[in-house]
Amino acid sequence: MKLSNPFVFRPGPVSFWTTIVYLAIIIPLIYVQETVPPAPPEKDLPQGVNLTEAWLDLEVITRSYHPFNSHSNDIVRQYLVRRSRDILERNGIDYTTDLTGGVPWESRYLSSAEHPAQAAEASARPRGATLFDDRISNVTMTNPQPNDTMGRYFEGNNFYVYIHGSEDPEGDWWTSDNVQRVARNGAGVLVNCHFDSVSTGYGATDDGVACVSLLQLLSHFTSKGHQPKNGIVLLFNNAEEDGLLGAKAFGYSPLVQFCNTLVNLEGAGAGGRAMLFRTTDLEAAEAYSKSPHPFGSVVASNAFERGVIKSGTDYSVFVDNYGQRGLDIAFYSPRSRYHTEEDDARHTSVDSIWHMLSAALATTESLARTTSTKFNGPRSDGRKDLVQSGRPTAGVWFDWYGSSWSAFSLRGLFAWTLTLLITTPIVLFVVTYVLVRDDKWYFFATRVDSSVGDGEETVSFGGWKGFVRFPFALVVATALTIGSVFLLAKVNPLIIYSSGYSVWAMMLSLFYFVSWLLLRGAHFVRPSALQRGFTLIWLFIITWVLSVFAAVAEDRMNMGAVYSLAFLHTLVFAAVLISLLEQYALPAKQDFARQLSGENEEGEEQEQENLSGDGGNEQNHEDRGEADIAAAPTETTPLRADEEGQGSSEQTTTFANTYRRPVPETRGATHSGNNRKRSFPPYENEQAWSGRLPTWTWFIQLLLLVPLYVTVLGNLALVQTTSMGMTGTDGSSLLVPLMGVGILTILLLLPLTPFIHRVSHHVPLFLLLVFIGTLIYNLTAFPFSANNRFKFYFKQVVDLDKGSNVVTLNGLEKFVRPVIGSLPTPAGQRIHCDEDPFLSNLRNCQYDASLLPPDVANGEKLENLISFEASKSKNGKTVLVSLDALNTRVCFLDTSSPIFGFSVDGGAKRDDRFGSFPPEGLQQIQLWRRDWEKGWNVTLYLGGNVLPTNQDSVEATEVDEVDDDPSGGELKRRAVREFVVTARCAWSDVNSANTIPAFHEVKQFMPRWAIVAKKSVGLVEITKKIKVT
């Protein structure tokens, strides 16, 4: 039995191979997205790394909530310091503890050596490690965000371990008189985590996994034979969750200028894989390539740079404010557990620890081995006040199925794109010219003079058939797909929160079915062997135009995120080239026309012989002969051949619904001598000449267009859905995640369109059923579940002056109201919801909570919690504020009118690295302290629109407070006399249910599909006002 060709361009093979190829790509991509690579056995781990130990450390760290403003935070800090000491001692490393930090650089040492003589000797040579226990650093700054008039004073308590490198400066170089010069000669690597959590989360992945990874890095790099060439600083910073404050306090360390490179470990999800969020340059991305399971792309980096992703991490401080180069590695999913009680050890795994740890270890090893000027030397921006980290190279990087890594320069991508823009049209033009010269250019061919016999006859080639089908189908399919996006956004936009794959199934099935219906329908009505080639030509035109914009983005905007277009352009060009070269298998058009006319004449003679017994009806024979060589049907040709058409136009249209086949398809096929014709029959009434085209080249085109491009883009598509699908409850746009799916659906299925008209009806009809089912589900299903919980935000405010106690639940009003309806306390109250001033999609819904007063200081009355005094100086230029509060580290000062300078007793001058002083002044100051009992003495400087100097923010220039204008002078004097200062102190420790009963009521009674997170720094704020006259 003869087996059929499995690669022929027929419905069966096309349906099979297109489905198999797409599934073979998409299923592994989904698997990579949804799973974490298993950790290796203990025997295969790098020396010094112990995952069992790391897991136990994580369980200890996440036993309780441990925000900066909690006593548990101190316990976690002590544990990490003790574990660091234990590791150093276990590995036999001499180390000292440096109690410096802040300014001035005064230090004392506590040596781990048993004898003072040994300690003295160790100070003269490179020590194994130094532990910096910083309880001195403080920073005064203004918030760098626009339209945010806020000042901050922060007292840090970071600690960090400096592992001395074999090529580092000798001795305790940071104590030398010329510390800056010595530091800048180094090439240290900073690896950072933060050990505080939010007040509503246990901080397993944000950022406990990172901190236990640092402990394992400490163990590895202090093991025998693993001392790095360049020193490594392992920073455990505090108070990241409340404004990246620990990283800013590190700016006063003498090691800042020493660390040229950075590996920041973070968590913006709660488990899964740790993704390379962003990097500064190509060299850093190449260092990451040593990771055994790389995961990420340049798209995320570009999204951060353009403000599409607004999540802030310590990375921005180290890179933007200090000038270091490096990477930001972070967990990114699932977002619904981020900053909630589900960010715990139960919802992560040892595999997740290994994924982050292995990436950090490989990257740190690579950076610590660098001895050239790759990360050292003058900066490209010429700034001398930042770390002299060399000249970075803009790059492009992405992973392949989470197992391999590609990284190359952005200039290389631009050169690639530019080469495609210039060379591909030229190559196609040359090939087309040769085809025209050889009379084998069948595209756009209309009629050819056969020049056979006594009369002049022309043969139609149907070279325009199928030309406009693809753009028409693309426009309609795109419109319907984008329309479905807006439909979902209108009816049930948050369905992507829990059912992202359902949204993908709906979009993909809709675009596929509509494209097939239109393209297959057009081919059925008017078959054309050129449809695949025309579709590829249109794809080439589209990708060429898009590549123009991509080249501008790459060259002018330094955007590497468009790299997938270079792949698509290259592959489409190759596929078009194959379609052109296919025509060399065809005879010259003139030869085919002559052959066709010759066969027609033979057919007529044979027919006359066969019909000679009919009484010599020559007129009928003559009429049939004329019909056989007639021109191809026109747009006025009737539906049935025996009906008359109207008009005289001879031009055909793409979707004309009749087609008169050339003579060889009818008469020639019955001629006994037409053996050649019988060897190359056309498919389904396509053009007669098309039977000579190769039937297997489509499969090569499929393999060119689909696997590589869909792999690159499909990975980005899944990451986009996972990272953005759950941001709607955070106040982000509800439309953007859905629109991303819609646009990526179109881009993913574009490579299929040249072949889709050959797909049998079974696949699209199945997808039609999928579309109907998923559409109904997506429009009607409740978007949240116990595994994908609706996130809302809690805050309680007690106003001592008004005697009020109000709880605010912030979130999407449609879902916040049912949460409030499930609580006992607000029952019967009229709930009013106001628009959030910062996030327009969210609402602040409030209810009276007087029955649930907080107990934040072991039974102390609320009115006794805050000690607050304020008075104006004799000259009226300043206001002196004395503020203290029980059992908290955080208080705010709000002023009724702007101030133009402030200082805190014992604090440093304002640091210009973190923002300039706003010309309009400040009306809020945040005050943070490292201990629990020392109060704040703050001086507020009054005045006009005068910007304090960068060197001393506490000096403000006096301006006239009273205008000479009699109509306004009295009001201004009254405003000055009634200067009001409001103290707001915050409490965040909810490890005991009795501390903030209103919060625990919410946790106890909220629906299973909802989960609570913090709204601001404190879960409870208590306020008190003073009028200063």
From Swiss-Prot:
Zn(2+) 1 binds at residues 194, 206, 266. Keywords: Glycoprotein, Hydrolase, Membrane, Metal-binding, Metalloprotease, Protease, Transmembrane, Transmembrane helix, Vacuole, Zinc. The chain crosses the membrane at residues 12-32, 416-436, 470-490, 494-514, 533-553, 561-581, 699-719, 736-756, 764-784. Pfam families: Peptidase_M28, PFF1_C, PFF1_TM. InterPro entries: Fxna-like_M28_dom, M28_fam, Peptidase_M28, PFF1_C, PFF1_TM. SUPFAM superfamilies: Zn-dependent exopeptidases. Residues 596-623, 637-684 are annotated as: Disordered. Residues 646-657 have a biased composition (Polar residues). Glycans are attached at residues 50, 138, 147, 937. Its EC number is 3.4.-.-. GO terms for biological process: proteolysis. One of its GO terms (molecular function) is metal ion binding. One of its GO terms (cellular component) is vacuolar membrane. Binds 2 Zn(2+) ions per subunit. Residues 33-415, 491-493, 554-560, 720-735, 785-1029 are vacuolar. The active site is at residue 240. It is a multi-pass membrane protein. Its cofactor is Zn(2+). Zn(2+) 2 binds at residues 206, 241, 339. The record marks 338 as: Transition state stabilizer. It is found in: Vacuole membrane. Belongs to the peptidase M28 family. May be involved in vacuolar sorting and osmoregulation. PANTHER family: METALLOPEPTIDASE M28 FAMILY MEMBER (PTHR12147), VACUOLAR MEMBRANE PROTEASE (PTHR12147:SF58). This is Vacuolar membrane protease. It comes from Metarhizium acridum (strain CQMa 102).
